Amino acid sequence: MIRTMMNAKIHRARVTESNLNYVGSITIDSDILEAVDILPNEKVAIVNNNNGARFETYVIAGERGSGKICLNGAASRLVEVGDVVIIMTYAQLNEEEIKNHAPKVAVMNEDNVIIEMIHEKENTIVL
């Protein structure tokens, strides 16, 4: 059986920009992407903690060290600058792969700096 499992999460990032007139996507600081192993053009699910919106888009790599989290195109209608968001990717894994799967979670501060990296095999952490 194949199951869809959370693979990476950027937890409590703050939206730094919103650009309605761009063709789409979310731009994320490349340092953050590398920390959680999210690739450019990878599909992401986004949850807005401020208004409850949930949506999907794809990733564009942003300038390193910028802390940039910019929603582009139609997705920009679902956020305001300063909103707290959770950005996730998922992987489809078989039962054997699941046994060794450890999602990467980057916990962010209010300046979009990683303050903690979590590599857990079991979902035992409450944030």
From Swiss-Prot:
It catalyses: L-aspartate + H(+) = beta-alanine + CO2. Is synthesized initially as an inactive proenzyme, which is activated by self-cleavage at a specific serine bond to produce a beta-subunit with a hydroxyl group at its C-terminus and an alpha-subunit with a pyruvoyl group at its N-terminus. The keyword Cytoplasm applies. Pathway: Cofactor biosynthesis; (R)-pantothenate biosynthesis; beta-alanine from L-aspartate: step 1/1. GO terms for molecular function: aspartate 1-decarboxylase activity. Its main location: cytoplasm. The active site is at S25 (schiff-base intermediate with substrate), Y58 (proton donor). GO terms for biological process: alanine biosynthetic process; pantothenate biosynthetic process. Its cofactor is pyruvate. The keyword Cytoplasm applies. The modification Pyruvic acid (Ser) is found at S25. It is found in: Cytoplasm. CDD domains: Asp_decarbox. GO terms for cellular component: cytosol. InterPro entries: Asp_de-COase-like_dom_sf, Asp_decarbox. Its EC number is 4.1.1.11. NCBIfam families: panD (TIGR00223). Heterooctamer of four alpha and four beta subunits. PANTHER family: ASPARTATE 1-DECARBOXYLASE (PTHR21012:SF0). Belongs to the PanD family. This is Aspartate 1-decarboxylase. The gene is panD.
